[in-house]
Amino acid sequence: SVRRRNKSDTIGKDHKITMKELYEQLGISSKVYDFGAEIEASLKERFEQFDKTAEYNQLKVLMAMQKNKVSAECFQSSSGYGYDDFGRDTLEKVYADTFHTEACLIRSQITCGTHALAIALFGNLRPGDELLAPAGKPYDTLEEVIGIRPSRGSLAEYGVTYRQVDLKEDGTFDYNSIRKAINEKTRLVEIQRSKGYQTRPSFSVKQIGELISFVKSIKPDVICMVDNCYGEFVERIEPTDV
């Protein structure tokens, strides 16, 4: 017996068929296809810039790997207590060189971003210190860490106070209010780069650098901590460069 071929049997087999015709066979009209092509063309320059930024940052990572001689040996497991874990130590050097920092802490035991932020906060703040958030309230997951929402073991329970300065209506830093908020107890300024779950714009490295310079001009010994979540490699420079 001979089975009759249906239309789906020949889809994509004719090399002369155009992309638009293939989409039409999938139920996408030529009008929709043309509209999509028009939008894609209008965004071409922007996406080319994204690609250039990605390539630039990829080269930075590759150079850091070459500098630290990443090899197959780095992927071998260690035994005992994990002292002198060659792969772990090399990975941290790669991160440090990529982001231009003195050192880096990259561990599988750090389970999430909130965990990493909590480590930085608890590692730098002591009873009597004050934490300042100049970009408004941080992520909801940090509320219990800081003590905005009551929680056992929070910074507030250990005697660390919290002060917050909301952004102006246009989404920019309120420098006058920040100046007034900084006092002798201010130990750490936490800057959340991403808008997170809010409607405000995310901050550029330039904006963050200007804020840090402003804060340091008022209190040079204050620690400026940047939550760079979702911001890595979207520019050619990072907050650690400013």
Question: For the regions a protein language model found, what residue spans apply to each?
Answer:
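PLP-dependent enzyme catalytic core of the Aspartate aminotransferase-like
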Residues: 15-16, 213
